């Protein structure tokens, strides 16, 4: 992971619904409406090309880290699949547990729920090499994984965070914290 942009938004109204225009855009693109926050992250993915993930911040224990899976770890994904994790799977984790498969799909435990009021937004750049072939081997696909396999612009993360923040505040209310933007060495542009 060479770039990881994030922001916490507190005080969102969990009962808020995405406006009809946004839900219609998702539907026309083959995506179903899930919740206002998740709909916004999916819309921003369609609009800018940057996959995002939203976590329910109350289920995060400490700082997030990116690491490879350890022997014996398991993860229940948002699609309900329970995985026994293999050492070549890159994960987003908090200080105690895996939260999701990096660039592919988030975990069920930390996903946005009907009563989520504090959201942790993530927009990262995942190297295609750590995503390619993993979904096929695991037996499922995701829109994020599809895009990361083919490459996403490493510079898009901060813009995606800002766009998603503006939409979430307009639709769900809340107070946005500062944006964090962790970087490593970016790949050379051709």
Role assignments for model-derived ranges:
Residues 1-190:
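RNA/tRNA-interacting regions in translation and RNA-turnover enzymes
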